[in-house]
Amino acid sequence: MTVIKDGWHGDTSKMFLVGKCAPHNQRLVQITQECLYKGIEAVKPGAYLGDIGNAIQKHAEKNYYSVVEDYCGHGIGKIYHEEPQILHYGKPGTGIQLKEGMCFTIEPMINQGTKYCKTLNDGWTVETKDGRNSAQWEHTIAVTKTGSETVSYTHLTLPTMIRV
């Protein structure tokens, strides 16, 4: 979901479990959310983009999942998609160094199987190449003087996982 307020863009997404879900799918959704928060925890002035990606990748792989490399987070502000690209994998201490005032999305896509995806003939729909499930969570993050602020949070944030 995106919001434009006074010319500034925001971007966020959540996963919702609908109906009765297998425990392995519930776990995928939970670990993906944890990957998002691991990435957010790495955000602070002086850190690097690679620190964010590494935190996400380590948590995903520790839980036997893979990180989609074909899609990434992005800078956001007066323009919806802008530089830098925020990879959800990487090596610590690499990439652009974070500075106070930067704003970007972190939106890891985590797969049960391999990291590979394919785009269907409609040019829009994407699925995993191996047919296994994938999950995604996203928040818009601002780098602050002392760390970060998740600007897509509100006091109205919905519970972590809702079963409809």
Roles of regions detected by a PLM:
Residues T146-Y153:
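Short, well-ordered strand-loop elements centered on a beta-strand within folded domains, enriched
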Residues H9, H74, H81, H139, ...:
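Histidine-centered active-site/metal-ligand motif
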Residues Y153-T160:
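Conserved small/polar residues in nucleotide/adenosyl-binding loops
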Residues Y89-G93:
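Short alpha-helix capping/helix-loop boundary micro-motifs
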Residues V43-P84, I96-M102, Q112-C117, K145-T146:
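Active-site cores enriched in adjacent His and Asp/Glu residues with nearby glycine-rich loops
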Residues R132:
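Metal-cofactor-dependent catalytic cores
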